[in-house]
Regions:
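N-terminal binding-site loop/beta-alpha segment at the start of enzyme catalytic domains
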Residues: 1-80, 146
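Conserved, mostly hydrophobic/aromatic
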Residues: 6, 18, 33, 40, ...
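N-terminal small/glycine-rich loop or linker at the start of catalytic domains
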Residues: 7-25, 83-96, 119, 124
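Short, well-ordered coil/turn segments that N-cap beta-strands
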Residues: 11-16, 44-46, 74-80, 117-121, ...
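Short, acidic/polar
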Residues: 27-41, 99-115, 163-167
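Alpha-helix N-cap and loop-to-helix initiation/capping positions
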Residues: 28-32, 60, 64, 95-103, ...
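Phosphate/pyrophosphate-binding loops at sites that engage ATP/ADP/AMP, CoA/4′-phosphopantetheine
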Residues: 73, 109-118, 262
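Beta/alpha (TIM)-barrel catalytic core signal, keyed to glycine-rich beta->alpha loops juxtaposed to Asp/Glu
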Residues: 130-274
Length: 274
């Protein structure tokens, strides 16, 4: 595995990380999850990316990670870089969502308990909160680092101007933002058009890509219809409406290009952003 410096920090991260968004919850077979995580770690994927609401159900991916720490990974904690996030709806009531100090602090405490950890290496604000003052959210990140519950902090899916404010706020308090996370793939190049990709580079931040395969659209999974065990068929975040006739034509065209390159579509999609 090749490792790359994260922006202008001292952190080296693997070129490919393992995200535990949809396939590591209670609805999935634990032994299969365990096999995947062990395989990734054995091949140099040291970064495991989670969030409080990953599952399904919400929280269960972190519980899976906690079982892995207990069963296999505890002796290797210092070789792992584990991230989590908070900002999407997690529990009922006014404090289980968004970016208030109350919500972020409570969420991180719950995440640490589920994962059986004393700290996370990286904690993100998971999305922009238009109602909570930016200063409140950002100062909470500062205080989380100073409390020792996270070593670094990151921003995920914030708009350009709010992100720039966040970079400056955190830098001035000696808790610089390590990384920006955004969805980026051959079908979704929004980080280019909004400017947040270039912004991260100019500010010396890393950029973490999520959904590089567009939840499986950029693979051979849907070339010949919708498989019964696919994410679309299971009615999750990827809707049947996503696979339009136009999209399918694009998938097949990209698959042809990949074949001429001697690659699978998934391999080409990952190579594109690497």
């Amino acid at each position: 595995m090749k490792y790359e410096r994260c922006g202008k920090s001292g952190v080296l991260l693997p070129k490919i990380s393992l995200g535990l968004w949809h396939n590591f919850g209670d609805v999935n077979d634990y032994n299969k999850c365990r096999e995947i995580i062990r395989y990734a770690f054995d091949h140099g994927i040291t970064h495991m990316d989670l969030a409080n609401n990953y599952g399904p159900p919400p929280g269960s991916a972190e519980e899976t990670m906690g079982r892995m720490m207990q069963d296999d990974l505890r002796p290797y904690r210092d070789e792992l870089f584990i991230s989590s996030k908070a900002g999407y709806e997690m529990w009922a009531g006014p404090y289980g969502n968004w970016g208030s100090r109350k919500s972020l602090m409570a969420s991180l405490n719950q995440s640490l308990k589920r994962m059986k950890l004393d700290y996370v290496d990286l904690f993100y604000t998971h999305r922009y909160d238009p109602e909570t003052p930016l200063e409140e959210t950002l100062q909470t990140l500062v205080d989380i680092v100073r409390s020792g519950k996270a070593l670094y902090v990151g921003i995920s899916r914030w708009p350009y101007e709010a992100t720039q404010f966040g970079y400056e706020y955190l830098r001035q308090r000696d808790v610089p933002c390590l990384i920006y996370q955004g969805r980026y793939n051959l079908f979704d190049r929004e980080p280019e058009t909004t400017g947040v990709l270039q912004q991260a580079k100019e500010n010396g931040k890393g950029f973490m890509v999520f959904s590089p395969l567009a939840q499986g659209l950029l693979t051979n999974r849907y070339l010949n219809g919708i498989p019964e065990d696919s994410r679309i068929a299971n009615g999750g975040h990827l809707k049947k409406e996503s696979l339009t006739e136009t999209t399918l034509k694009r998938i097949k065209a990209l698959n042809d290009i990949a074949a001429r390159r001697g690659q699978t579509l998934a391999e080409m999609a990952i190579a594109w952003f690497l």
